[in-house]
């Protein structure tokens, strides 16, 4: 099960993002609404909502705001008429970029995303141009205080598909449907991950030099600062010198 995806290195930005948690209130609130609308308010039956609540708590969104967003999603309270949209394009160095958005105005959002991609050295593409390069996976990052054998012992029984050595951390992948059961199994065994999310993981990476890597991170930051953008994914393999 050992491997090396290098997907983890672009996640190293999270330490910087965490300093700006307040900007994620809007994003996690939208995800709570969308998740509740899609699968109802019962977290036992709605894994997406369970993950959304965990993400909301991670950025310290108040409980009353969490409850309010869920009620807006189920229709118990009036709320925005949000639509989920996926935009595809290319970034510096020719890397593939996926932009997940939640919007009440498609025309506004597509224009803004197109503008930001162009401004950041990329370009909007047609639907389907890069999404085939990615698979949706549950992704966990564990410190090396745990051994691969320990992770395998718990993971293999609860849906883990792959365990990879990513230098300072172990990375565990699973199918999206197994994400919450696997997280619960790890936590029950006292194995709390440093990071866990359902993400679009690329099949192959595109290596970038320092200049292109810095341009890409600037582009991703611009996209993530847009209030309609929920998540940004790429298949960039960033140089180690960016994280020294």
UniProtKB/Swiss-Prot annotation:
Coiled-coil ranges per UniProt: none
Any one Gene Ontology cellular component term annotated for this protein: cytosol
Keyword annotations of the record: Cytoplasm, DNA-binding, Transcription, Transcription regulation
GO molecular function, one term: DNA binding
Cellular location(s): Cytoplasm
Any one GO biological process: regulation of DNA-templated transcription
Signal peptide: none
Family: Belongs to the TACO1 family.
Protein name: Probable transcriptional regulatory protein DMR_30850
